[in-house]
Design a protein with these regions (language model features):
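RNase H-like, Mg2+-dependent phosphodiesterase core
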Residues: 1-78, 85-262
């Protein structure tokens, strides 16, 4: 049993395998593969399953980067996504992100498919590796004045400009073409293309943080929980207290029992 290290307890081996990184797992499993102890055998099996799952996840992310390059080419490629389109309070937020092909941000996906904690972690990694990140926020009163279609076009143009880049290609997820030059629309792009997914995550995390801050100013509207969307608690608060300056008046008519505004 050449590969067995008898001086190391089975519990220690199991702990080592459980904490091993994706890159470390194959060598560790090879090192302990002839160890006959059941705890070690089970730990190796769990590690291999974890490695296989992570490998599949990395292949998914690799595909997102490859499609980004396929559609965008070798020039400056920026991904754009928005959050807050359907909310009744708070801004419309658009983010634009330029990602290099390397290093890759493992785990990126459509922000709606990620937990808040996962989005927070990924937003830090995206900020570390991105070539550029830009934001544009359209205030509720401006959304009321210009309408959502124009607001999105304005925000897309503003976010791309905020990157400081002149992109050769702008990849967008369902946003209106014509807002910026060299734009390409990709249906469900936030789940298919790396830079759009990154923009989706950054937009969501940034706007959510804004809504939590607004909640401290207007606690009666439950903005930290609802993020400005029409939750039952938020609707009831609108009916009870009327609207505050964060509300989109044009979105809230059905919720008001009186004409009382702010």
């Amino acid at each position: 049993m050449a590969n067995m290290t008898s001086s190391v307890s089975a519990s220690q081996v199991a702990g080592e395998l459980a904490s091993a990184t994706f890159e470390e797992i194959p060598a560790l499993v090879e090192h302990y593969r002839e160890d006959p102890r059941q705890q070690v055998i089970k730990a190796c099996e769990r590690a291999l399953k974890r490695h296989a799952k992570e490998l599949a996840e990395r292949e998914r992310v690799n595909d997102m980067y490859e499609l980004m390059h396929e559609l965008g080419g070798d020039g400056v490629v920026v991904g754009v996504d928005e959050v807050g389109r359907g909310s009744v309070a708070g801004p419309l937020t658009v983010c634009a992100v330029c990602l290099p092909m390397e290093p890759r941000v493992w785990g990126i996906n459509d922000s709606k498919k990620l937990t808040p904690a996962r989005r927070e972690l990924l937003s830090v990694k995206i900020a570390e590796v991105a070539t550029a990140i830009g934001f544009c926020h359209i205030a509720p009163k401006d959304i009321d004045e210009m309408g959502m279609a124009r607001a999105i076009r304005t925000a897309v143009a503003g976010a791309v400009a905020d990157t400081g880049l002149e992109p050769d290609c702008v990849l967008m997820d369902g946003n209106p073409l014509g807002a910026v030059p060299n734009a390409r629309d990709v249906v469900k792009g936030d789940a298919k293309i790396a830079c759009i997914a990154a923009a989706s995550i950054m937009a969501k995390v940034t706007r959510d943080e804004m809504m939590v801050e607004y909640d401290a100013e207007y606690p009666e509207y439950h903005l930290a929980e609802s993020k400005g969307y029409a939750s039952p608690e938020h609707i009831e608060a609108i009916r009870k207290h009327g609207l505050c300056p964060l509300h989109r008046v044009s979105f809230c008519g059905n919720f008001l029992q009186t004409e009382r505004l702010f």
